[in-house]
Amino acid sequence: MFPRASALAKCMATVHRRGLLTSGAQSLVSKPVSEGDPEMFDILQQERHRQKHSITLIPSENFTSKAVMDLLGSELQNKYSEGYPGERYYGGNEIIDKSESLCQARALELYGLDPAKWGVNVQPLSGAPANLYVYSAIMNVGERLMGLDLPDGGHLSHGYQLKSGTPISFISKYFQSMPYHVDHTTGLIDYDNLQVLAKAFRPKVIVAGTSAYSRLIDYARFKEISQGCGAYLMSDMAHISGLVAANVVPSPFEHSDIVTTTTHKSLRGPRGAMIFFRKGIKSVTKKGKEIPYELEKKINFSVFPGHQGGPHNHTIGAMAVALKQAMSPEFKEYQQKIVDNSKWFAQELTKMGYKLVSGGTDNHLIVIDLSGTQVDGARVETILSALNIAANKNTIPGDKSALFPSGLRIGTPAMTTRGFGREEFSQVAKYIDSAVKLAENLKTLEPTTKLDARSRLNEFKKLCNESSEVAALSGEISKWVGQYPVPGDI
């Protein structure tokens, strides 16, 4: 045997022996979850079955695409990348830089933004932290912000606190928070009252954003009010970012200084978030002096190193895919269908005698006012869950309890993804009506002994689980909805 051939054979034998020695370790990283962890695989299969055989009405949920899922489970998650493109604290990030830069470029393109006038940070892990990062970037501890009150359709991350002043969101511990409200007669944001409050409170930031508000937002009026008190206008479009991208609802960008959003709701991407911020000149003084925005460095520093370490590169790659999908004609058609379905759904519920907060909807969600029935939102959510329908209890204007509110929040994005149209949402309205009636009957069977509210709800859950009527309807719904495809055929 030639010397070179002998050396090669020896080397191959060494590699082979090493392979034998490390076969267990190799198996550990190469087995699919079905083989490596059957217990967790069984849980995954259960959730897949639940999603396929349930009606998803939670307006903040959606079914993301197979392409997005591919990136979420990709090798991009293996890389650590503290810092920003071109300015990393670790080597080997040249390709990751391409991914993040592509995501940023697509985000600006999707919303028609000039890169000279707008920037975007795509590293925030989710929506509530993204809002905190903005506040921390432009406010000192103890400075003031205003957001829509939670019972009126706002969000915890907009500074929610109890009427007593007790902070619920830690944001209201770090900053002074004052809520604005809807008009309880119309269910619409009371802009006149907001203007009065803002002039007196003088907030540093006003948040234009909601999580349970079914009407359009007047961003021009928000800008007028913000300018009148010298506040930044931060618009949180987490719920409607897909609708905004498709131009089926008004865009906040023309009037806002900062815009935040999640990417997994109507945008139908992965569970991530983005912060858009203005660049260039903010204003000009009477003497002609230009005042710059100076938001880019502050916000980027707040994200990293202020609050986060390395970004989730697999999520950013998946966001880039979702943003490209959102530029397609098919996506725009989907978003219009979301709104059309929502309005139809609202009409069907109204015909059945249900009262809706604000009287209807202009977007992707509906809030049912159950105060005219014999059950609260918690019980209706409970029985719907037993019937394979996912919805959520929600506070409505005037509610005093977030645990047992009078509202039920429902939406159309997820089931529109699965192909639902008018006929299907008419059927879903009937299922909701049946659920409310069943809940009213079961509530009369609750123990008459004195129990606290939580214990009574637990008794109601037992009644749902023991009801033959609930079991029969649950089976019917599971079989019916299981006929509709789920992305990726899960």
Swiss-Prot record:
Record flagged with keyword Transit peptide: yes
GO molecular function terms noted in the UniProt entry: glycine hydroxymethyltransferase activity; pyridoxal phosphate binding
Listed GO CC annotations: cytoplasm; mitochondrion
> What processes in GO biological process is this protein linked to?
glycine biosynthetic process from serine; one-carbon metabolic process; tetrahydrofolate interconversion; tetrahydrofolate metabolic process
Q: In which pathway does it act?
A: One-carbon metabolism; tetrahydrofolate interconversion
Which locations, inside or outside the cell, does it occupy?
Answer: Mitochondrion
**Enzyme group, top EC level?**
transferase
**Enzyme Commission number, as recorded:** 2.1.2.1
Q: Which UniProt keywords apply?
A: Mitochondrion, One-carbon metabolism, Pyridoxal phosphate, Transferase, Transit peptide
Main localization, broad class: mitochondrion
Q: Where is the transit peptide?
A: 1-20
Subunit annotation:
Homotetramer. Interacts with NAP1.
Further comment: In eukaryotes there are two forms of the enzymes: a cytosolic one and a mitochondrial one. Present with 17700 molecules/cell in log phase SD medium.
Give the protein family: Belongs to the SHMT family.
Functional note: Interconversion of serine and glycine.
- NCBIfam families under this entry? PRK00011.1 (NF000586)
Q: What is this protein called?
A: Serine hydroxymethyltransferase, mitochondrial
